[in-house]
Amino acid sequence: MQSIYINLDDSGKLSKKEIISVYGGLVFLSKKEKDKFITQYRSIVNDIKCKYCKNKDLCNKKCPEIKNTNIKNSDKRRIMNYIKKYFIVGLVISNQNVYNHIIENKAAKGRFLDYSLRRMIKEVINNQITNNKIDSKEPLKVIINIDEQTTKSNGYYNLHDGLVEELKYGISNFNYSCTYNPIVFNDLDVKVTYQDSGKSYLVQAADLVSGTIRRLILNALEEKQDINNILNNFVNYKIILPWKKAT
């Protein structure tokens, strides 16, 4: 069976106090590709992580997690140079363009983030179909790995069921008189797992990706540079929401 692994983490929060919130990560099209990434990524991390241990003389082998916010730029570059060999995806939410009633209501915020993730995941899969990496008429297994801490803070509505419905059956939105067509026309198996980033190299890598995307955008905004051009040099596939400013 065809497989696609989509591994995601967030950077920034959906809040009017922040300009953007980001989801970023890596996509693999086979277990072999995923396992190969983990093996080499783990090797790089093992080579640098002892630098960040505060009590080397009392080492208990429980090294600190390597995160976007706690490593030196030289080590981050080394890791990112490896990550960039794979397919990088990004979802950017322009917080200022999101309706206030969504941001101010926890349930509404959770539903919006759930919608945004479903939109991103569907478009990533559709991109792979368009580029003949996935056959829409053959059985497909979709594995989504997300940082569990992200889930606790955002409270997703129902990511699994929403993905199955949208990918296999399509969705009709009667409020806006529009229909989203299905893109998978055979058996579909969707698995969503929420992982401890301290134990998941996939989520750790996604943390570095999302943090890098957010930093690139904030720097571009400050320097008045074109965001799309900046992102295109790093991300293989991106989606920016909402498209229009809220009124």
Where are these regions (language model features)?
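Phosphate-ester processing/binding pockets and catalytic centers
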Residues: 1-247
